[in-house]
Design a protein with these regions (language model features):
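C-terminal substrate-binding subdomain of Rossmann-fold SDR/epimerase-dehydratase oxidoreductases
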Residues: 27, 31, 211-349
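Amphipathic coiled-coil/heptad-repeat helices and related helical stalk/stem segments
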Residues: 52, 74, 203-204, 235
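Short coil/turn segments at alpha/beta junctions that flank glycine-rich nucleotide-binding fingerprints
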Residues: 180-184, 200-201, 246
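A glycine/serine/threonine-rich, flexible loop-to-helix segment
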Residues: 148-149, 200-208
């Protein structure tokens, strides 16, 4: 692997107002205070834009952070950004997120996750300063796979949602560009990311909003779902470590590039039962005074069948990440949900 020192480098982060993107920008500045970070985000209204503005306001304190409001599906804009800033490292986190939303709004996924990612790849191809492209894939690429834990060595050609299909497509497109144009690229399959200032469409956040309003929360597959919940700080720690080590460029016996390409899982290697997760969340919401001590959780829970596009379990095998980067996520669920509950109490008071 080629080591990259992020100090004094120009780094482009797409989806910079997003949950992972904004936390990544903060982590980059901890790692490399003299870096220049260009953030792009279309600030779409898929969920409350006030959350995105809150995250951006937290990034305003960094003098070398520049925010560009725009869409990665806008090829002219992306081309101009790359020509102007000449990034050394690109982290593509911009994407239309959410499995269930992809069933009713497929066009948004094609625009952002396919056309947008293609524009990033094309810009990387023509960017002489580029040392590493890192991009978000997803645990959803494992689809209906039965073998757990999920390993990056497993076949992943059974997506159960369009979202998953677009993420697998990103890996294939990146592989082709790595092979054709010798672009070092690393895809990261994130597992159920959660934490403060997250996405309201994620279970922990959506459940909290509903419980606060006295509404009933629906627990899918009658509670027989397990998720490898991964705390956002652990995710961005993994991303920064990966950014600093790019797959090596080398040629094969045929004289053509061996694709400088890699894919890793970033997950907690600890699937939690959804009912246990709801129990811990409820305890932490009471502790943070988001909900009263006498709140009747049983009266606000409804067990319902599995949703289309969902899978019963996600479980990350992170042995490759540990081997190559000496890192594995370690934040336990209670600690992470406590941090979320305390943030929620403050943000919505």
């Amino acid at each position: 692997m080629s080591t990259i020192n992020l100090d004094n480098k120009t780094i482009l982060v797409t989806g910079a107002a997003g949950f992972i993107g904004s936390n990544l920008v903060k982590r980059i500045y901890q790692e490399a205070p003299s870096a220049t970070v260009i953030g792009i985000d279309n600030m779409n209204a898929y969920y409350d834009v006030a959350l995105k503005e809150f995250r951006l306001n937290e990034l305003a304190k960094y003098p070398t952070f520049t925010f560009v409001k725009g869409n990665i599906a806008d090829k002219t804009l992306i081309t101009e950004l790359f020509e102007k800033y000449k990034p050394s490292v690109v982290v593509n986190l911009a994407a239309q997120a959410g499995v269930r939303y992809s069933i009713t709004n497929p066009d948004a996924y094609v625009e952002s996750n396919l056309v947008g990612f293609f524009n990033i790849l094309e810009a990387c191809r023509h960017c002489e300063s580029l040392e590493h492209l890192v991009y978000a894939s997803s645990s959803s690429v494992y689809g209906s796979n039965k073998k757990v834990p999920y390993s990056t060595d497993d076949k992943v050609d059974n997506p159960v949602s369009l979202y998953a299909a677009t993420k697998k497509s990103n890996e294939l497109m990146a592989h082709a560009y790595s092979k054709l144009y010798n672009i070092p690229s690393t895809g990261l399959r994130f597992f159920t990311v959660y934490g403060p200032a997250g996405r309201p469409d994620m279970a922990y956040f959506g459940f909290t909003n509903k419980l606060v309003k006295g509404e009933t929360i629906k627990i899918f597959n009658y509670g027989n779902c397990k998720r490898d919940f991964t705390y956002v700080d652990d995710i961005v720690e993994g991303v920064v470590r990966v950014m600093k080590k790019a797959p090596d460029k080398k040629n094969g016996e045929d004289g053509l590039p061996i694709p400088p390409y890699a894919v890793y899982n970033i997950g907690n290697q600890n699937p939690e039962n959804l009912l246990d997760f709801v129990q811990i969340l409820s305890e932490e919401l009471v502790r943070a005074k988001v909900l009263p001590e006498d709140y009747d959780f049983e009266a606000h829970k409804e067990l319902v069948p599995m949703q289309p596009g969902d899978v019963p379990v996600t479980y990350a095998d992170t042995s490759a990440l540990e081997r190559d980067f000496g890192y594995k996520p370690s934040t336990d669920l209670r600690t992470g949900l406590r941090n979320f509950a305390e943030w929620y109490a403050e943000f919505y008071k």
